């Protein structure tokens, strides 16, 4: 067996998704804690907390207690290498989350036991369904009162359209929480609130008939549990690995992330059943992870991960072959070889140099503006991985500068921050305006904050009469030039130099499309097609 095949089989690359405040970042911390990657988990609840979550590394995230960027973390567990991608729960950063989901092989969905399936969860589930991504579910905050577990499973099946297969089942809830029972092994894990956020090994009884269990949880609760389990085992599906890997069934776990409870069974089950790196589609062929030659694609760019050096890092998912430090790789979009020196692996913002990487791993490449989201790297073959889109923004603002002498820094900041993909930067052909597009208001706050803290620029964003944007293409260059001349007041270029139509109203866009039927107007821009691969 080749080294690439063996190492690929060890990898598990997944993302954690949820509605905001379901406890996703806290659960991320606890998975790292149980995986031995960190010694003490940070509380993300209080702004004044002494510790902050490992995955919420940006200053703004620590102040607000929310995740607005995606973090990448790698740790070993039970002979496997786990690559965990934490994603922003906030709806305004959905595009970042969408692209992260293109870089993983499975997902873990976190649901608040009191709130059930929420709006953001539904949207993320739709994205996962597009790719048939296998999903495990963790129903969180069991230490609080919440919905009836049976009703909750029914809600997940009804609203999300995926079959539930409970693997653990709660014994009580809120103040009456006593533990969970593993339906596959019959083991009972008793609940003990976490102390000092360190790893807790829960007390385990080998079965519901084990001596001493009734004394610990109470005779009546044990009797109620037997009754409930009879009902759930008759009404719900048993775990089927084939259905799970096909994205049609989700194994369900119950627990309390903040109390370290229910995390261990989840992690053990995940390592055993989650898929190793899968094959990937390109515009020309399917790439198998076990191929010996390196391929990979960039799904994220992060500016200023190290405030001391004002760096930009491109996050690349390795799809096949083996990466070695300092190797040259073919950058398909530019048709040039780039030396991938000083590549990094991550624990949120803590980075260390990586000597080698295999399929499923995510590495950071230092980027001086040459690498963009969606770019493919190979060992010479012209390939382009598909499914990494840019979406048309829904909100637009004009950047206004307090100090005109800082214009250069403002342009640099807007360009670099837009490379991350959460916002888009447009320059109208007929004016000197600097237009920023986003899908949510929070993104403008984040950009203003980062411009000030990372680029020393005080900027505000004022409304502008733009309703929507469309990328415009035409195979006939003469026709495109004629369209450009007639519509120059509505045209701009994005940070990649692509032509974009900025429509003041929906009616204006409709008229423009009717008047130029040979011009293609796109609401999304597939990065793969920007490299000229047919």
Swiss-Prot record:
<dbReference type="InterPro" id="IPR031157">
    <property type="entry name" value="G_TR_CS"/>
</dbReference>
<feature type="binding site">
    <location>
        <begin position="18"/>
        <end position="25"/>
    </location>
    <ligand>
        <name>GTP</name>
    </ligand>
</feature>
<dbReference type="Pfam" id="PF22042">
    <property type="entry name" value="EF-G_D2"/>
</dbReference>
<dbReference type="InterPro" id="IPR004548">
    <property type="entry name" value="PrfC"/>
</dbReference>
<dbReference type="InterPro" id="IPR000795">
    <property type="entry name" value="T_Tr_GTP-bd_dom"/>
</dbReference>
<keyword id="KW-0648">Protein biosynthesis</keyword>
<dbReference type="GO" id="GO:0005525">
    <property type="term" value="F:GTP binding"/>
</dbReference>
<dbReference type="InterPro" id="IPR041732">
    <property type="entry name" value="RF3_GTP-bd"/>
</dbReference>
<keyword id="KW-0342">GTP-binding</keyword>
<comment type="similarity">
    <text>Belongs to the TRAFAC class translation factor GTPase superfamily. Classic translation factor GTPase family. PrfC subfamily.</text>
</comment>
<dbReference type="GO" id="GO:0003924">
    <property type="term" value="F:GTPase activity"/>
</dbReference>
<dbReference type="InterPro" id="IPR009000">
    <property type="entry name" value="Transl_B-barrel_sf"/>
</dbReference>
<dbReference type="GO" id="GO:0005829">
    <property type="term" value="C:cytosol"/>
</dbReference>
<keyword id="KW-0547">Nucleotide-binding</keyword>
<keyword id="KW-0963">Cytoplasm</keyword>
<feature type="domain" description="tr-type G">
    <location>
        <begin position="9"/>
        <end position="278"/>
    </location>
</feature>
<dbReference type="InterPro" id="IPR035647">
    <property type="entry name" value="EFG_III/V"/>
</dbReference>
<feature type="binding site">
    <location>
        <begin position="86"/>
        <end position="90"/>
    </location>
    <ligand>
        <name>GTP</name>
    </ligand>
</feature>
<dbReference type="GO" id="GO:0016149">
    <property type="term" value="F:translation release factor activity, codon specific"/>
</dbReference>
<dbReference type="InterPro" id="IPR005225">
    <property type="entry name" value="Small_GTP-bd"/>
</dbReference>
<feature type="binding site">
    <location>
        <begin position="140"/>
        <end position="143"/>
    </location>
    <ligand>
        <name>GTP</name>
    </ligand>
</feature>
<dbReference type="GO" id="GO:0016150">
    <property type="term" value="F:translation release factor activity, codon nonspecific"/>
</dbReference>
<dbReference type="InterPro" id="IPR038467">
    <property type="entry name" value="RF3_dom_3_sf"/>
</dbReference>
<dbReference type="Pfam" id="PF16658">
    <property type="entry name" value="RF3_C"/>
</dbReference>
<dbReference type="Pfam" id="PF00009">
    <property type="entry name" value="GTP_EFTU"/>
</dbReference>
<comment type="function">
    <text>Increases the formation of ribosomal termination complexes and stimulates activities of RF-1 and RF-2. It binds guanine nucleotides and has strong preference for UGA stop codons. It may interact directly with the ribosome. The stimulation of RF-1 and RF-2 is significantly reduced by GTP and GDP, but not by GMP.</text>
</comment>
<protein>
    <recommendedName>
        <fullName>Peptide chain release factor 3</fullName>
    </recommendedName>
</protein>
<dbReference type="GO" id="GO:0006449">
    <property type="term" value="P:regulation of translational termination"/>
</dbReference>
<dbReference type="InterPro" id="IPR032090">
    <property type="entry name" value="RF3_C"/>
</dbReference>
<dbReference type="GO" id="GO:0097216">
    <property type="term" value="F:guanosine tetraphosphate binding"/>
</dbReference>
<dbReference type="InterPro" id="IPR027417">
    <property type="entry name" value="P-loop_NTPase"/>
</dbReference>
<dbReference type="InterPro" id="IPR053905">
    <property type="entry name" value="EF-G-like_DII"/>
</dbReference>
């Amino acid at each position: 067996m080749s080294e690439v095949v063996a190492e690929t089989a060890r990898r598990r690359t997944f993302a954690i998704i949820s509605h905001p405040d379901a406890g996703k970042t806290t659960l991320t911390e606890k998975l790292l804690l149980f995986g031995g990657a960190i010694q003490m988990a940070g509380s993300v609840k209080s702004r004044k907390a002494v510790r902050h979550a490992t995955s919420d590394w940006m200053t703004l995230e620590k102040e607000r207690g929310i995740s607005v960027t995606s973090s990448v973390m790698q740790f070993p567990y039970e002979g496997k290498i786990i690559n965990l991608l934490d994603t922003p729960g906030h709806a305004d950063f959905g595009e970042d989350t969408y692209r992260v989901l293109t870089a993983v092989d499975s997902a873990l969905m976190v649901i608040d036991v009191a709130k059930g399936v929420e709006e953001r969860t539904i949207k993320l589930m739709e994205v996962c369904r597009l790719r048939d991504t296998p999903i495990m579910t963790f129903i969180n905050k069991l230490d609080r009162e919440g919905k009836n577990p049976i009703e909750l499973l029914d809600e997940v099946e009804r609203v999300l359209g995926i079959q539930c297969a409970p693997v653990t089942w709660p014994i009580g809830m809120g103040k009456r929480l006593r533990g969970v029972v593993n339906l596959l092994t019959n083991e009972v894990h008793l609940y003990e609130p976490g102390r000092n956020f360190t790893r807790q090994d829960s007390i385990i009884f080998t079965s519901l008939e084990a001596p001493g269990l009734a004394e610990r949880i109470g005779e009546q609760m044990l009797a109620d549990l037997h009754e409930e389990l009879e009902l759930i085992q008759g009404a719900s599906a048993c775990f089927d690995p084939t259905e799970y890997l096909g994205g049609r069934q989700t194994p369900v776990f119950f627990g309390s992330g903040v109390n370290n409870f229910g995390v261990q069974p989840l992690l053990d089950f995940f390592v055993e059943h989650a898929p190793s790196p899968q094959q990937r589609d390109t515009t020309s062929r399917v790439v198998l992870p076990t191929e010996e030659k390196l391929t990979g694609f960039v799904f994220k760019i992060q500016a200023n991960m190290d405030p001391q050096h004002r760096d930009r890092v491109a996050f690349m998912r390795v799809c096949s072959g083996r990466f070695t430090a300092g190797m040259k790789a073919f950058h398909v979009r530019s048709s040039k070889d780039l030396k991938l020196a000083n590549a990094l692996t991550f624990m949120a913002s803590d980075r260390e140099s990586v000597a080698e990487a295999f399929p499923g791993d995510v590495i950071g490449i230092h980027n001086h503006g040459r690498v963009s989201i969606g770019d493919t790297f190979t060992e010479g073959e012209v390939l382009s991985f598909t499914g990494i889109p840019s979406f048309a923004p829904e909100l637009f603002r004009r950047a206004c500068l307090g100090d005109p002498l800082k214009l250069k820094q403002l342009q640099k900041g807007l360009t670099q921050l837009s490379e991350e993909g959460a916002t888009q930067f447009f320059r109208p052909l007929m004016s000197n305006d600097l237009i920023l597009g986003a899908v949510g208001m929070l993104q403008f706050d984040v950009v203003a904050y980062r411009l000030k803290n990372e680029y020393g620029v005080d900027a505000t964003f004022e409304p502008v009469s733009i309703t929507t944007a469309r990328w415009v293409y035409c195979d006939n260059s003469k026709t495109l030039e004629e369209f450009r001349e007639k519509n120059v007041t509505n045209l701009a270029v994005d940070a990649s130099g692509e032509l974009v139509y900025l429509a003041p109203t929906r009616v204006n866009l409709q008229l423009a499309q009717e008047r130029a039927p040979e011009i293609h107007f796109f609401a999304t821009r597939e990065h793969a097609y920007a490299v000229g691969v047919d």
